[in-house]
């Protein structure tokens, strides 16, 4: 009897962050194949690490940082820029009569997240996200992203020159000639990563994010409907029928109105 857990199934084995949140410099977290629990008091960095995972293994267009906080109706105040900059303190500026933030990394800099996966049967891949900011970068749309999917185990240490030189795609291809995928946007990269990991449906990623970040799962029936049951094709047919009926009803009303107007003059 083998002690290997789910051989052939890719599982996260290592999380790396570089200049992410208050984790300054390089930090590496080894993840047990049997399962991993992140716990600690408020402000210890739990959500920071989970959010790091979701920047790569996340659902494009539906991402929320610090979802556990926003779930309770609060605004998390976290986004890609605050994580890269290392926001750590809010202060009231008496002179400006405004709230200002303190950052660990205010100037031009780069951040990185790395996820290493192993199938425990010899297969290994690494997914990397490099994020470059200029001194003037203040919004997420201004962050220059580079997503890399590579065979084997690759460290963010190997990406330092890429990060320092604005994460050029040509430089990345030259440094890593065996690239599996390279993209500027999460959506196509996520599709390539899911294919490699054997995840057929994007809904599985949404469910992963939900279970990772939720303080409570709430209504189990609703959870099943939203994340585990595909929407039947009949829903689309019903929507189309309703839309066509509305158009037909409008056209009929127009004809009736025109006919009534013509009868007035008879």
Give names to the regions the model predicted:
Residues 1-157:
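Extreme N-terminal "head/tail" segments of very large remodeling/mechanoenzyme assemblies
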Residues 36, 54, 119-259:
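Extended, charged alpha-helical "arm/stalk" segments used for dimerization and assembly
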Residues 67-72, 243, 257-262:
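Juxtamembrane/interface motifs at transmembrane-helix termini
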Residues 264-266:
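Conserved small/polar residues in nucleotide/adenosyl-binding loops
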């Amino acid at each position: 009897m083998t002690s290997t857990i789910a051989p052939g199934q890719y599982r996260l084995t290592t999380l790396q962050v570089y200049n992410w949140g208050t984790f300054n410099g390089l930090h590496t977290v080894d993840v047990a194949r049997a399962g991993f629990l992140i716990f600690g008091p408020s402000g210890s960095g739990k959500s920071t690490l989970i959010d790091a995972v979701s920047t790569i293994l996340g659902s494009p267009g539906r991402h929320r940082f610090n979802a556990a906080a926003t779930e309770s109706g609060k605004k998390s105040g976290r986004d890609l820029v605050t994580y890269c900059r290392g926001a750590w303190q809010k202060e009231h500026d008496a002179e400006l009569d405004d709230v200002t933030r303190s950052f660990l990394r205010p100037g031009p800099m780069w951040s990185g997240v790395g996820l290493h996966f192993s199938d425990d049967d010899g297969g290994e891949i690494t997914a990397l996200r490099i994020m470059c900011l200029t001194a003037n970068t203040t919004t997420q749309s201004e962050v220059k992203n580079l997503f890399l999917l590579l065979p084997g185990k690759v460290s963010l240490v190997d990406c330092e020159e890429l990060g320092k030189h604005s994460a050029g795609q040509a430089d990345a291809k030259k440094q890593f000639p065996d690239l599996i995928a390279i993209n500027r946007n999460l959506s196509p990269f996520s599709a390539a990563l899911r294919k490699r990991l054997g995840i057929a449906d994007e809904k599985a990623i949404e469910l992963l994010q939900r279970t990772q970040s939720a303080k409570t799962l709430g209504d189990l029936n609703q959870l099943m409907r939203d994340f585990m049951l595909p929407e039947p094709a009949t829903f689309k047919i019903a929507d189309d029928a309703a839309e066509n009926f509305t158009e037909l009803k409008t056209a009929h009303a127009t004809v009736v109105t025109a006919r009534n107007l013509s009868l007035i003059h008879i």
